[in-house]
Swiss-Prot record:
SUPFAM superfamilies reported for this sequence: CbiD-like
Keyword Zinc-finger annotated: no
GO molecular function: cobalt-precorrin-5B C1-methyltransferase activity
Cystine bridges: none
Family of this protein: Belongs to the CbiD family.
The species this protein was found in: Clostridium beijerinckii (strain ATCC 51743 / NCIMB 8052) (Clostridium acetobutylicum)
Protein name per the record: Cobalt-precorrin-5B C(1)-methyltransferase
Any single GO BP term: anaerobic cobalamin biosynthetic process
The entry's keywords: Cobalamin biosynthesis, Methyltransferase, S-adenosyl-L-methionine, Transferase
UniProt key word Transferase: yes
EC number: 2.1.1.195
Gene name, Swiss-Prot/TrEMBL: cbiD
């Protein structure tokens, strides 16, 4: 078991390693056995871009006449990761060495800037000794705007580099190999990832910029949000931002297309800033009143540990509208915004309109007026209490 820990909110959590690290380790181990059939391996060590060496247990090695397959189980540590425990396989076989300089691995042409920094020609000569491909359960990119060109296997640039470099460490001089990365459960697991939204079909992506999985990593989630916005902004001047599964489902009810909806979790501020940098013209934000009320207060990270203000926004707006203080106090006594809305009942359209106005105002202030903003607010699973501007006009 990988023994690296971090403290998150006072809890000691175990780190894991990425699908990219698993792929690099499996490919390295398979290469060693391919050229040393009598050798047995129980574990394999690789270097990660983070500068930390990782030793991974080998689940299975299968030896065949002209190739070797190695399986490593993904270890996500204490991170709630859909890929935790799945098999990552690398099949390595010898292929004919080439004398003339012909690029047979398409990614060498596409990723020169990532793979080669110094001594470019020398490194290209070395890297073309490892031909890398995606196999079963590794997704195929079908849209523009991602790190990988359309039509190629979804093995991101850093894992590609890791796989090649680890194989080259153990590849005998003059030899050349083909490496095929596969994930037997990849197509099934991919349905629980961002891949379908990004136009990556048939499997998961081989990911990782550091090689290490950090538990509850905000950076990893923000990276996913940025990728989705960047990709969807190519064909959409307007995007629809929502917070999670409930909002995502409600967007479908409202008739928004999957190609324009982005789930941004609690990181609405980051998502808005990314929209601006990607030249998005307008956004519609769709959310539960509990999350949306925080934005009206000027909070752009809506996680409860960052800001617990919700009922106070409803209470303040009621007071500003001149409602009796007994009603204001009743709102503050509720446990949730959901409860407050149900307690109030019908007849408070002006209240929700005022909250909506403040949401739009705060967002425009946050992005310095660089986005047109509409808002949709609901309670329960999909009960609308504010259908704003363009939604009402449709």
């Amino acid at each position: 078991m990988f023994e690296m820990y971090v403290d998150v909110d006072g809890k000691r959590l175990r780190c894991g390693y990425t699908t990219g690290s698993c792929s690099a380790g499996a490919a390295k181990a398979a290469t060693i056995i391919l050229f040393n059939k009598e050798k047995n391996l129980n574990e394999i060590e690789i270097a990660t871009p983070k500068g930390i060496d990782v030793t991974m247990p080998i689940e299975l090695i299968e030896k065949f006449d002209d190739y070797v397959e190695c399986t490593i189980l993904k270890d996500g540590g204490d991170d709630p990761d859909n890929t935790h425990g799945i098999e990552i396989k690398a099949m390595v076989k010898k292929i004919k060495p080439i004398d003339n300089k012909i690029f047979q691995d398409e990614d060498l042409q596409k990723f020169d800037s990532v793979l080669v920094e110094d001594s470019r020609a020398e490194k290209e000569d070395e890297l073309e000794r490892v031909v890398l491909k995606g196999g079963t359960g590794v997704g195929i990119v079908t849209r523009e705007g991602l790190f990988i060109p359309k039509g190629q296997a979804a093995i991101n640039p850093v894992p590609r580099k890791m796989i090649k470099e680890e194989v080259l460490k153990v590849l005998p001089p003059g030899e050349r190999v083909e490496v095929i990365i596969s994930v037997p459960q990849g197509e099934k697991v991919a349905k629980k990832t961002f891949n379908p939204r990004l136009g990556i079909v048939g499997g998961i992506s081989i990911l990782g910029t550091t090689g290490i999985v950090y538990p509850m990593s905000e950076d990893a989630l923000k990276a996913s949000i940025k990728i989705e916005i960047t990709q969807k902004a190519i064909n959409n001047e307007r995007l629809v931002l929502t917070f999670g599964n409930l909002g995502d489902n409600y967007c479908k009810e409202l008739g928004f297309k999957e190609e324009e909806v982005v789930t941004c979790s609690n990181f609405i501020g980051f998502a808005l800033e990314t929209c601006v940098s990607c030249k998005v013209k307008s956004i519609i934000i769709v959310g539960h009143i509990g999350k949306m009320s925080k934005i009206a207060y000027g909070c752009f990270n809506t996680h409860s540990k960052v800001n617990g203000v919700r009922l106070e926004v409803i209470a303040l707006e009621l007071a500003l509208l001149g409602y009796d203080m007994s009603l204001v106090k009743r709102v503050l006594e509720e446990k949730t915004c959901e409860g407050a809305v149900k307690m109030l009942g019908d007849g408070y359209d002006k209240l929700y309109e005022n909250i909506g106005n403040k949401i739009v105002q705060k967002i425009k202030e946050h992005v310095y007026g660089e986005l047109e903003v509409d808002a949709v607010m609901y309670y329960g699973a999909s009960n609308p209490i504010l259908l704003w501007k363009s939604i009402k006009d449709n």
